[in-house]
Amino acid sequence: MAQKDNQKEMNDQLKVRREKMQFLKDEGIDPFGSRFERTHLAAALHEEFEAIEKDDLDVKNQEVTIAGRMMSKRGKGKVGFADIRDRSGKIQIYVRKDEVGEDNYKIFKKADLGDHLGITGQIMKTDMGELTVKATHLTFLSKALRPLPDKYHGLTNVEQIYRQRYLDLIANPESMDRFTKRSKIISAVREYLDTHDFTEVETPVLHGQAGGASARPFITHHNALDINLYLRIALELHLKRLIVGGMERVYEIGRVFRNEGIDTKHNPEFTMLETYAAYFDYKDVMDETEGIIRFAAHKVLGTGQISYQGQAIDLDSDFARVHMVDAIKAETGVDFWQPMTVESARELADQHHVKYEEYWQVGHIINAFFEEFVEDTLVQPTFIYGHPVEISPLAKKNAEDDRFTDRWELFMHGNEYANAFTELNDPIDQRERFEAQAKERENGNDEAEGIDEDYVEALEYGMPPTGGLGIGIDRLVMLLTDAASIRDVLLFPTMRPDKQENEEI
């Protein structure tokens, strides 16, 4: 019954708003406006005039022109107030019939919450000291035919927030702030890399072969060529071809696609930063990564001391650097430095209730121990390095112990934020790694990479020692905006089809 009443109320509101739209048309007013030039944004008005006393503002008699969405409206008779919001913030307007004229005042009286108005008037302060634009002329710019979400409670339905992000941005200023910060974070990352002599490039989204990461790809079909293509799962292999070509320092910020599950940390399409620098090794890339994250934090937040989900995170101090095997030993007492067979590793896994796949080697089990017992304990920024060779097909083997690679992952608050390594530049070793991955695929690992012959051929022309980095931009934005879910930092996250839409179809 309540649902039917709500629907009737909505239908009544839609009807009334359309009647008001028709009234505007009958009065010769375009309800959907045209170009409008303003002199100030709301924030600029506050910045310029907030400190000026009321009487001084009256003497100044400064005319301004603003535009925005009407978010609240109050008053009666011949006088009214409203709050106007633009992209920078909110400002109050004061409308008097004897100031704007009867015809112009009709526009204000007929305006609903959500409508866009243009206002010209004098900047003033009320007796309560609130900065206000006293209107001398109103221009109708756009009629909202649907009502906004409840002005007192905002938009709180999580599903609706994600499906109708435009309503979320209207109703929840903190969401607008989060996405504004996202843009600034990406700009800061670019600024840091540009000033360190990196060149931004663009590489193909459609690949003839999926590679550069262990993930299941999306497959599409090119009709003209009659071939299957893959949406990229990583940026890596094309960027390293550019290192072979002599570009030496390159980066790309772009969308990648992985045909996998959806949760608070994963979305099928997400934004990656990858950088490659000739003559770097994985330790140089640690320094680079600290610099990028610290610079972005200070640029956008003004500090390296942040809070994420109630936990203080220190981005100003040097990030810890711990070998994966040492981290496992510290938490469990299990010593994977000791040489061992697959059977011995499986026995240890059984004793510690760590699940494993039939095709796994010792290195896979080491990584499983890390994920099970260590990952969630890493609160402060920590580089975990020395990943097993079995799970690192594109990383260079460690010179002192070839069971491990010169690879690391960065963890904070139990989450991974970056992955990097000294790149494997030996084409013979690379082919052997690809072949091992192909064998894993045959044994049931559908995320294993195949053999990319063109990439191996590129390496045969000679790639200098290179340090490569991948940072998940979405997770970095989550960290710096204290967002609990990746969906909170994606304007339009992937969602299950809405039941109502399916029923209509």
UniProtKB/Swiss-Prot annotation:
Molecular function GO terms recorded: ATP binding; catalytic activity, acting on a protein; lysine-tRNA ligase activity; magnesium ion binding; transferase activity; tRNA binding
* Alphabetical list of Pfam families matching this protein: tRNA-synt_2, tRNA_anti-codon
Cofactors demanded by this protein:
Mg(2+)
Query: Where mainly found?
Result: cytoplasm
- Give me the reactions it catalyses: tRNA(Lys) + L-lysine + ATP = L-lysyl-tRNA(Lys) + AMP + diphosphate
List where in the cell it is found.
Cytoplasm
Cofactor binding notes: Binds 3 Mg(2+) ions per subunit.
> What family classification does the UniProt entry report for this protein?
Belongs to the class-II aminoacyl-tRNA synthetase family.
NCBIfam families in UniProt: lysS_bact, PRK00484.1
Q: What is this protein called?
A: Lysine--tRNA ligase
Organism for this UniProt entry: Latilactobacillus sakei subsp. sakei (strain 23K) (Lactobacillus sakei subsp. sakei)
